[in-house]
Amino acid sequence: MNPMNEVQISKATVSIGVGEAGEKLSRAITLLEQMFDQTPVKTFSKVTNPEFGIRKRQPIACKLTLRGEKADKAIEMVLEGINKNIKPTQFDAQGNLSFGIKEHIDIPGMKYNPDIGIFGMNVSVTFEKPGYRIAKRRIQQKKVPAKHRISKEETMKYMEDNFNVNYVTE
């Protein structure tokens, strides 16, 4: 196979949406730091929503972006939390994968800590092929050609080969 056509992981993003600022958000930040040995960033609300008690630019969630070897280890770890079962509908047309974990204690090695509590999280994995830099660079920025874009099937095969995932239909 041509090495320029090999699918690789660009990044893995893990986020916890708390919905409020304060103690609960700081506990979610502590949890992500403990799980991935990296400091997460806070994300802020974009609009005011009085029904939920949210004001504009109020911190309501935290997220973490992992790249390289850290991303591979993190994906392997969180896939164990869902027993490596993925639905084909969790892949989008560009070949990205997104799934949720209901409780972080489902992940092997994670223990319940009463000081932190239980949090669910969203995991998004972005894939790319070598040469995707042309779309991100500053000078002479171009689109990735259609024949070089990643399809859903390519990503599904990559996950099956490298992470031994099972595809469930439900």
From Swiss-Prot:
GO terms for molecular function: rRNA binding; structural constituent of ribosome; tRNA binding. Disulfide bonds: none annotated. It holds the Pfam family Ribosomal_L5. InterPro entries: Ribosomal_uL5, Ribosomal_uL5_arc, Ribosomal_uL5_C, Ribosomal_uL5_dom_sf, Ribosomal_uL5_N. GO terms for cellular component: ribonucleoprotein complex; ribosome. Keywords: Ribonucleoprotein, Ribosomal protein, RNA-binding, rRNA-binding, tRNA-binding. It comes from the Archaea. GO terms for biological process: translation. Part of the 50S ribosomal subunit; contacts the 5S rRNA and probably tRNA. Forms a bridge to the 30S subunit in the 70S ribosome. This is one of the proteins that bind and probably mediate the attachment of the 5S RNA into the large ribosomal subunit, where it forms part of the central protuberance. In the 70S ribosome it contacts protein S13 of the 30S subunit (bridge B1b), connecting the 2 subunits; this bridge is implicated in subunit movement. May contact the P site tRNA; the 5S rRNA and some of its associated proteins might help stabilize positioning of ribosome-bound tRNAs. HAMAP family: Ribosomal_uL5_A (MF_01333_A). Belongs to the universal ribosomal protein uL5 family. This is Large ribosomal subunit protein uL5.
